[in-house]
């Protein structure tokens, strides 16, 4: 009666348990037809039965459409054959709400042309509307913006249409335009007041911006970024055992010892010359600043006596030179410069003559140079006192 099916699970994806047809059921979304003559889907649940159910529904729809068309045709035939009867007048909602203002005759089954609806009195429809004007002020930094809806003199009923009007008063635009110019005039006035008061410290600070430092220790920032070059190592690096000191016997320098000493002296001399040039440039800049300050002081003190002007210039020059020496922090403070001269014209000459005294590196005098034995060139020399440098 029943088919016995082995439902033992297997690991093969191709083998699946098979069920007989009598255990299969119809999905719940399929509704069987109401016609008792049609085959039931429970008896033959197959694609053919589903197709038959769909065909049955289509036939039922066609029958319903035909019946509807027949009813419409019958209705049209009845309307054409029967005479048209006039409609009875129906009272409106206004008449029901206002029975005293409008009088109507009693309802009659048939309306005749002689029937007249008499209207005794109608209430006049008067509408009044009050509109309010509101003004809102939004404070801004420089402009006052006033928001106010327009006021309509006409009357409206239950509808308000506010129109937004923006009033911008540009009262402060002139002040805004004059701000940069006003700031500039204030700066100029401050400079004039400082010059009239002979404030030497402020004049030095103002003149420092015009200094042209051409030394390596300058305030200027390079525009192009400094990029380290890519070092190429065609050969492998030497082992740590090969990195010995020059005094070790295993080292084989490419240049003799005397030539290396000469190169070291040349390097020290070049560094001293560069330092001399830097100090000379700094002294020249200081002298230029002093001359500019003297000119400003002379122009501001035209009304005073000549003797007082000369004395003030000498005092101001000394103070300015000392202040400049203390304010220049880029170069090392070596020795106090011998620049306390009363005459401005002699500053450059004194600086050129005192270059050897400014540099402390040249204070160590080199002893008498002795030509070593076996050397034919007098340039390759040695000294009794050597300067130890980490070269």
From Swiss-Prot:
It comes from the Eukaryota. Residues 212-223 have a biased composition (Polar residues). Residues 150-162 have a biased composition (Basic residues). Residues 118-162, 184-258, 272-327, 337-356 are annotated as: Disordered. Residues 118-149, 186-211, 244-256 have a biased composition (Low complexity). This is Uncharacterized protein DDB_G0286175. The lineage of its organism: Eukaryota, Amoebozoa, Evosea, Eumycetozoa, Dictyostelia.
């Amino acid at each position: 009666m029943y088919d016995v099916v082995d439902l033992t699970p297997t690991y093969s994806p191709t083998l699946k348990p098979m069920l007989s047809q009598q255990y299969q059921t119809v999905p719940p979304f399929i509704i069987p037809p109401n016609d008792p003559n049609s085959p039931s889907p429970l008896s033959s649940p197959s694609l053919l039965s589903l197709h038959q159910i769909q065909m049955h529904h289509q036939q039922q729809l066609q029958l319903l459409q035909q019946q509807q068309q027949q009813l419409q045709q019958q209705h049209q035939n009845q309307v054409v054959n029967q005479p048209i009867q006039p409609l009875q007048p129906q009272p409106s909602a206004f008449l029901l709400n206002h029975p005293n203002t409008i009088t109507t005759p009693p309802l009659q089954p048939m309306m005749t042309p002689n029937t007249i609806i008499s209207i005794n009195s109608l209430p006049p429809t008067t509408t009044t509307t009050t509109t309010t004007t509101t003004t809102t002020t939004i404070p801004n930094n420089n402009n006052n913006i006033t928001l106010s809806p327009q006021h309509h003199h006409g009357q409206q009923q239950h509808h308000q249409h506010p129109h937004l009007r923006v009033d911008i008063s540009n009262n402060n635009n002139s002040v805004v335009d004059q701000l940069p110019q006003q700031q500039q005039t204030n700066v100029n006035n401050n400079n004039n007041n400082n010059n009239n008061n002979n404030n030497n410290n402020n004049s030095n600070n103002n003149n420092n911006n015009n200094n042209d430092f051409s030394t390596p220790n300058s305030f200027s920032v390079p525009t192009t970024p400094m990029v380290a070059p890519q070092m190429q190592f065609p050969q492998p690096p030497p082992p740590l055992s090969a990195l010995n000191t020059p005094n070790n016997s295993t080292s084989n320098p490419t240049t003799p010892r005397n030539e290396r000493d000469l190169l070291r002296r040349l390097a020290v001399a070049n560094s001293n010359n560069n330092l001399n040039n830097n100090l000379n440039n700094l002294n020249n800049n200081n002298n230029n600043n002093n001359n500019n300050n003297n000119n400003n002081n002379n122009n501001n003190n035209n009304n005073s006596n000549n003797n007082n002007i000369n004395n003030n210039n000498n005092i101001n020059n000394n103070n300015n030179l000392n202040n400049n020496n203390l304010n220049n922090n880029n170069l090392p403070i070596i020795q106090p410069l011998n620049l306390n001269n009363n005459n401005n014209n002699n500053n450059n000459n004194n600086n050129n003559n005192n270059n050897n005294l400014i540099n402390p590196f040249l204070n160590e005098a080199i002893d008498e140079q002795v030509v070593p034995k076996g050397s034919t060139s007098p340039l390759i020399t040695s000294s009794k006192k050597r300067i130890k440098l980490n070269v």
